[in-house]
Amino acid sequence: MEPVSAECQLPPEDDLLEMMMEQSFTEPEEKSKDKSTRKIIPKTKLCRGLNNRYCVLNVKEVYAQGEEKHLTITASQEGDDLELCILKDDWVALHIKPGDIIHLEGNCAFDNTWTISRDTGYLILYPDLLISGTSIANGIRCLRRSVLSEKFKVCDKGSRQMLIGTMLHDIFQRATTRGFTDSVLQELAHHTVHGPKYLKEMYQLKLNQTDVMGEVQEYLPSFAKWAIDFMTHPLNQHQINVTRPTAGDPTEATKVSEFLDIEENIWSPRFGLKGKIDVTARVKIHQKSKSHLKIMPLELKTGKESNSIEHRSQVVLYTLLSQERREDPEAGLLLYLKTGNMYSVPGNRLDRRELLKIRNELSYYLTNVVHKSDNGSKEITLASLPALIADRQACKFCSQMRNCALYSRSVEQQIENCYIPAEMIPVVQKETEHLNKDHLQYFRLWYLMCTLEGNSKDSKMGRKNIWMMSSSEREEDGQCIGNLIRTGPVQTISDGQHLHSFQRKSGTVPATNLMSGDRVVVSGEDKFLALSSGYIKEVKHNNITCILDRSLGKLPEDLLFRLDHEEGGGGLESHLGNLSRLMENSPVSDKLRKLIIDFSKPNFVQHLSSVLPSDAKDIVANILKGLNKPQKQAMKRVLLSKDYTLIVGMPGTGKTTTICTLVSTLHLKTCTSCLVDDHREAAGTHRSHRHSKGTVNLGKQKRQHRVTSTTSSTSAKCRSKTEPAVSAENKKLQKLISGSHVCIMVNGHKTFSQNNYIIFFDNILLLKKLPLHYMCAFALIHHQCFKGCVKSVSLVRELGMSESLFKRLERNQEAVVQLTVQYRMNSQIMALSNKLVYEGRLECASDRVSNAVVKLPHIKTLLLELEFRESQESMWIKDVLEPSNPVCFLNTEKIPALETEEKGGISNWIEAKLVFCLTKLFLKAGCRPSDIGIIAPYRQQLKVISNYFNSLSASAVEVNTVDKYQGRDKSVIIVSFVRSNIDGKLGDLLKDWRRLNVALTRAKHKLIMLGCVPTLSRFLCLEQLICHLKSKNHIYDLPAGAHEHMPV
């Protein structure tokens, strides 16, 4: 009997297998095949071998002796060398379609056929999506919860049990190096509970350190007992059942002989898994007359001793993860810290298979999050999640209940034929009854936009290139530095911060796009993926230093490393977490929904006397001294505000000064504490120096977490808040928060939930405003041309994701005040943005500011030297150096200076050389290196310019992107626009008028721009700039070969 076949999700063209069998090998059919195949194959690297990657070209359901799925697959980017993968048994339920990427485990038959069945092989769907073992284990009972937990990672609220569990993990892990004696355990417990590490969490949960210490001490005898039972007693005294596939008798005596690592971080692109193993231990196993050593994962649990399927599943998954670093452990250990009882968990095929199938389901729902319309329109809608389970009791205590109900009501109830259990409909309705139609629509739209943006960043800059590309390939893109060895000892800065120094095994550090502050992942060259991660501290010609979260000091000295740039996903989890909080049923969220979604008008009090103490008049008058009129108006509006104030801060108008003055004045408001959230690193640092007294600095300061604190002498004038039951050290923190009132660069730290006034710069994404949930009123200080992150999907911009919070709220004009008096730029530089952006509203604060010029003490000597060497080709140089010419645009059209496109990006070598030579001339004229700043929109150009400066002892000359200069200024700014071509290529970076405005407003005394006028004139915003520069005679046409006749 012939098998019956039904095709599933075929590509638009004929079936590829049939086409291969029937084609006459004529040229047109081969072209048709190539077109069909290439349309399906995504732009990703495919390969065979241990870490194979196949692309699915076709899926066919076959009914013979039983249901099967036949997958036509290829490891060729051109679609050649087709292979067949047969899914049998319960693997046929796998959601899979043409274009999907898979990894196969098992044996491929001689006829290039893979068989994945109940007994043989595994298939990993989307293996480059690494999913944690915890998420997979939680998906056993409710897959929907696991999907939501991956999306809304910041929504799980902390609890007493979770905090104490974390502390107990910490104590046990530290004891692995210190010992498990009673005295050591007591010392570790005291240090953990009373130290600063968990102070903020205890404060947030209103916990007393004495009570916490009491709970922790209940576990310590079990720690000691476990160590005696499984570390010090003779091998044959304590037996646990260890069932391993290669073992016979399951009863084996087990002894932990050595601890090799704690919190071992492992990425496994082979199985699509990631995780941190609590403890990695060398275990001595005795069976009958033989004994042998195994390296096993040891999972710690602090809750009830349940030996549950979820707990055991995590251990099974860790046995798979361990194969990335060593041989298959075949089993793992599960230890319950409350009792000291330990169980062996075998990593048998049945459990591994079922868990990998759950992982595949998770990856399907995490990847296929949107539906594109089938009717030819561009409409994109959200897809449904795994079905709700019909278990009210389980849902009642689920941490994702709110998000589950939100998604069901706002998204799934709008999808035709989406199944929702009848008994769960009332539960969903009750959980979301406080939300109206507009709120649900807002949630649906922002979830869609965040999802599209996150998917775009994952596909463009996903971390998969770290394991799919060699270090040499990544070096060509400027995203990696390979062939490194560690030099010198590792310096431990603090817990989780270890300073490492690397140098090239042979030669110097290659030119790279990696810069100070970039996040990196450190791996071995040939193996050991993601050993550690952290941030680059410094890149030099001969070495590179990094601050990493794990010490690599115990690894072999001759081990070769690679440093890969790791681009984040744009904070998707943070945005979705904030979106979820905005929808919660609480007074603060209700107020925010009314202001942000319903556009309720903000409220103001009528008189300052109602918000300031009666004796504060003289103090306020003294504070306001030196402020200009717009700044004083802004101060008054903020003090009168009950909801929010919007401050338009134009470039150089004293936004930082305004913030500092606001903070000082808010000290005087009864019971008012203040958070200041500013993503501009330089401005945040400058402001924290001004407020060195009375500040708490929590957050990322040049990518290094640190806390500095002092109390203000004026804080005694304000009343303390009611203190929770916390210990003396907690009270110190609370006194600091409620007394000194200022928190710089918080970015929404949970500790500060009792603060009730927030001042922050409006970044471009509305959903970044987590600190809003801790306020009763807030002030947005917004530079209307401030450049935030560029959205990579035009559809996302069209849907409205580029809308800032300020833009959304400014329809209520009574809340808006403008700062228009600037102290930075001289009048000619200011005229550029005033003409192009501000419609003449910007004004200089004084004649001194207006007429200021760059100070070049040796300019006369240099000009005499230039006259002596004068040539027709370099006449323009004198005009550029002249202090009384603050604005110069150097047109490179005639040189010519064409751009170069490389894997690492776009650069312009001639512009880079001109920038370098001009900088040397300014230095020779007496300008200080720290007063010169160089800006380019492309990282590749920064790399080229930096290469020139490697030979110049002028390290203080800063070379950076436009975005890095936000909130900062220099006396001299040189801008390289880079783009110069004859084929009309533009790109997106120079199309953004906000980024252009930032570049134009960084210079105080001298602004020099380099670019090709015909090319740049294709950009609308730059065309307007060039027209203005022409009208003012600021454009200098450089002669042919100008870069070859520079007098340096």
Curated annotation (Swiss-Prot):
Query: Catalyzes what?
Result: ATP + H2O = ADP + phosphate + H(+)
UniProt-annotated stretches for the region Helicase activity: 522-1048
Name a single GO biological process: DNA replication, Okazaki fragment processing
Q: Which GO terms describe its cellular component?
A: mitochondrion; nucleus
Cofactor names: [4Fe-4S] cluster
Residue ranges annotated as compositionally biased, kind Polar residues, are: 707-717
Q: What detail does the entry give on cofactor binding?
A: Binds 1 [4Fe-4S] cluster.
Question: CDD domains of this UniProt entry?
Answer: DNA2_N-like, SF1_C_Upf1
Keyword Iron-sulfur assigned = yes
Q: Which GO MF terms are attached to this record?
A: 4 iron, 4 sulfur cluster binding; 5'-3' DNA helicase activity; 5'-flap endonuclease activity; ATP binding; ATP hydrolysis activity; DNA binding; metal ion binding; nuclease activity
Q: Which UniProt keywords apply?
A: 4Fe-4S, ATP-binding, DNA damage, DNA repair, DNA replication, DNA-binding, Endonuclease, Helicase, Hydrolase, Iron, Iron-sulfur, Metal-binding, Mitochondrion, Multifunctional enzyme, Nuclease, Nucleotide-binding, Nucleus
- Name the source's superkingdom: Eukaryota
Its EC number(s): 3.1.-.-, 3.6.4.12
| Chain residues that bind [4Fe-4S] cluster | 142, 395, 398, 404
Q: Where in the cell is it found?
A: Nucleus; Mitochondrion
Q: Where is this region: Nuclease activity?
A: 86-521
**InterPro entries from the UniProt entry:** Cas4_exonuclease, DNA2/NAM7-like_C, DNA2/NAM7_AAA_11, DNA2_Rift, DNA_replication_fac_Dna2_N, P-loop_NTPase, PDDEXK-like_dom_sf, SF1_C_Upf1
User: Which of this chain's residues are annotated to bind ATP?
Assistant: 649-656
Family matches, as Pfam families: AAA_11, AAA_12, Dna2, Dna2_Rift
Q: Where is this region: Disordered?
A: 683-724
What is known about what this protein does? Key enzyme involved in DNA replication and DNA repair in nucleus and mitochondrion. Involved in Okazaki fragments processing by cleaving long flaps that escape fen1: flaps that are longer than 27 nucleotides are coated by replication protein A complex (RPA), leading to recruit dna2 which cleaves the flap until it is too short to bind RPA and becomes a substrate for FEN1. Also involved in 5'-end resection of DNA during double-strand break (DSB) repair by mediating the cleavage of 5'-ssDNA, while the 3'-ssDNA cleavage is prevented by the presence of RPA.
Similarity-based family:
Belongs to the DNA2/NAM7 helicase family.
The protein's name in its UniProt record = DNA replication ATP-dependent helicase/nuclease DNA2
Specify the species. Answer: Xenopus tropicalis (Western clawed frog)
Q: Highest lineage ranks of the organism? A: Eukaryota, Metazoa, Chordata, Craniata, Vertebrata
